[in-house]
Amino acid sequence: MSDEEAAVVEAAQVATAAYCAGDTDAFLPYIHPERTTFGPDGGRLASFDAAALRAGMAAGSVQAQVEWEGLQATIHDNVAVSTGYLVGTWTIGGDTREGRWRETIVWLRGGGGWQVSHLHVSECLA
């Protein structure tokens, strides 16, 4: 793994740890302001809403206790793609599920480092 790929993997791990800790101040710098998501709830394409995330985490209706498995990254100039599995529990809208999810992230490199531009999470059935 190259140093650049390792930096993206580390960004994913640090951002996920902040999310799991409910630390939005540590999580949000990793999120591009125009991020889109296909989330773990199986819903339609959604734009990121930082205020909704903060409110959901404060209320306990949005939370996760997940860990990465098989996380890897590929770099294409100022764009990176990371893929891996998240294993554990995820609560969205008060509905808690345990399992394994496939996650693909498109990252953009900017002045502040790597930020998530698009995230696709889906349940792994295999």
Where in this protein do the model-derived segments appear?
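Short beta-strand edge/turn micro-motifs at domain boundaries
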Residues: 98-126
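Hydrophobic/aromatic beta-strand elements that line small-molecule binding cavities or substrate pockets
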Residues: 15, 53-54, 68-73, 85-88, ...
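Short, cysteine-centered beta-strand-loop-beta hairpins and adjacent loop/turn segments enriched
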Residues: 61, 89-98
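A solvent-exposed, acidic/Ser-Thr-rich amphipathic alpha-helical stretch
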Residues: 5-11, 24-76
